[in-house]
UniProtKB/Swiss-Prot annotation:
Ubiquitous. Serine/threonine-protein kinase component of macronutrients metabolism. Forms a functional kinase and phosphatase pair with PPM1K, serving as a metabolic regulatory node that coordinates branched-chain amino acids (BCAAs) with glucose and lipid metabolism via two distinct phosphoprotein targets: mitochondrial BCKDHA subunit of the branched-chain alpha-ketoacid dehydrogenase (BCKDH) complex and cytosolic ACLY, a lipogenic enzyme of Krebs cycle. Residues 159-404 form the Histidine kinase domain. It is linked to Branched-chain ketoacid dehydrogenase kinase deficiency: A metabolic disorder characterized by autism, epilepsy, intellectual disability, and reduced branched-chain amino acids. This is Branched-chain alpha-ketoacid dehydrogenase kinase. It comes from Homo sapiens (Human). It catalyses: L-seryl-[3-methyl-2-oxobutanoate dehydrogenase] + ATP = O-phospho-L-seryl-[3-methyl-2-oxobutanoate dehydrogenase] + ADP + H(+); L-seryl-[protein] + ATP = O-phospho-L-seryl-[protein] + ADP + H(+). K(+) binds at residues 328, 330, 333, 367. One of its GO terms (cellular component) is mitochondrial matrix. The lineage of its organism: Eukaryota, Metazoa, Chordata, Craniata, Vertebrata.
Length: 412
């Protein structure tokens, strides 16, 4: 039974409080502790939020509409005007588009199995989406620059409210993992939710960035992106993290088309590269624990052509065991999967996170790094593939389609 059908089964479509809160919270309600009472009240308010919006026709109507995805080229050429009209057009597009995409995700939460959807952490994320829909649809039509400025404030607030969504989803699924019977359904839900979130954040951040006058940028689009420079930035980050954990880190050599420059959106690389680099460095250090100050280099090769950008990350970290190879791109939230020892599957560097904010941080520590990176790459018309030589090392191939290439670009 899915969550939506159970929620609608209460008297008058209401949601019974006791099943929603679960035994643990029901027990706390009997406590005289002020803290426990506060938690129960928060859970009660959460249940009211979900209940009050489940039968709202606006969400159902918006969920039936298709999303209008833009190509980066469309965003690039619509991103400048002398009179500022591009800001109004962009804001009006967001005002129409964001509620539709968020309604699609609310529908996804409704389709989760009831026992998973009632997990307090998952329910909190569900509530965030419902509140975002409410705030966006309550905003009056954007008529002038003053309206647009207020809309920007709302967008910034929502971006901040949702910055920890990936971490929360991972936590919620790990908490309810013993109740997961259909892993394909949950993985489909995660793929759709995470890639939709990426698209929403790219569109929203692009609009906010249109207000900035930054050299070589139109919104979030860099007109002369250097893959070598962005790789170097995340190499420095991953090496610091690795040195903190192991006392040393592999050196990194970059070769190939190191002088390449082209229009591209850095944001997806800012999500994906830290995960791939941390994996390579951890695997290298874990396979050379006897000689931590004499470890092989990680080698990164850049290949640029008129269709796509390819980044190969090669490590000598011992490769991936045959038994793990088929599962390494899966989300790992079940008990059996949590026990694996492969560095690419187990939590990455524990919960040690030197990079806060909404970039790579949310993927850390839950075995979500590779599958999330794979989902992002596919959403952007590319791919993420592994070639492993067990006993030697692993090559990771990241392919991302150009936004101005010979073939049609991806849509956001």
């Amino acid at each position: 039974m899915i969550l939506a059908s159970v929620l609608r089964s209460g008297p008058g479509g209401g949601l019974p409080l006791r099943p929603l809160l679960g035994p643990a919270l029901a027990l706390r309600a009997r406590s005289t502790s002020a803290t426990d009472t506060h938690h129960v009240e928060m859970a009660r308010e959460r249940s009211k939020t979900v209940t009050s919006f489940y039968n709202q026709s606006a969400i159902d109507a918006a969920a039936e509409k298709p999303s209008v995805r833009l190509t980066p080229t469309m965003m690039l050429y619509a991103g400048r005007s002398q009179d500022g009209s591009h800001l109004l057009k962009s804001a009006r597009y967001l005002q129409q588009e964001l509620p539709v995409r968020i309604a699609h995700r609310i529908k996804g939460f409704r389709c989760l199995p009831f026992i998973i959807g009632c997990n307090p952490t998952i329910l909190h994320v569900h509530e965030l989406y419902i509140r975002a829909f409410q705030k966006l649809t309550d905003f009056p039509p954007i008529k002038d620059q003053a309206d647009e400025a207020q809309y920007c404030q709302l967008v910034r607030q929502l971006l901040d409210d949702h910055k920890d969504v990936v971490t929360l989803l991972a936590e919620g699924l790990r908490e309810s993992r013993k109740h997961i019977e259909d892993e394909k359904l949950v993985r489909y839900f995660l793929d759709k939710t995470l890639t939709s979130r990426l698209g929403i954040r790219m569109l929203a951040t692009h609009h906010l960035a249109l207000h900035e006058d930054k050299p070589d940028f139109v919104g979030i689009i860099c007109t002369r992106l250097s893959p070598k420079k962005i790789i170097e930035k995340w190499v420095d980050f991953a090496r610091r993290l690795c040195e903190h954990k192991y006392g040393n880190a592999p050196r990194v050599r970059i070769n190939g088309h190191v002088a390449a420059r082209f229009p591209f959106i850095p944001m997806p690389l800012d999500y994906i590269l830290p995960e791939l680099l941390k994996n390579a460095m951890r695997a290298t250090m874990e396979s050379h624990l006897d000689t931590p100050y004499n470890v092989p280099d990680v080698v990164i090769t850049i290949a640029n052509n008129d269709v796509d950008l390819i980044i190969r990350i090669s490590d000598r970290g011992g490769g991936i065991a045959h038994k793990d190879l088929d599962r390494v791109m899966d989300y790992h939230f079940t008990t059996a999967e949590a026990s694996t020892q492969d560095p690419r599957i187990s939590p990455l560097f524990g919960h040690l996170d030197m990079h806060s904010g909404a970039q790579s941080g949310p993927m850390h520590g839950f075995g979500f790094g590779l599958p999330t990176s794979r989902a992002y790459a596919e959403y952007l018309g590319g791919s993420l593939q592994l070639q492993s030589l067990q006993g030697i090392g692993t090559d990771v191939y990241l392919r991302l389609r150009h936004i101005d290439g010979r073939e049609e670009s991806f849509r956001i």
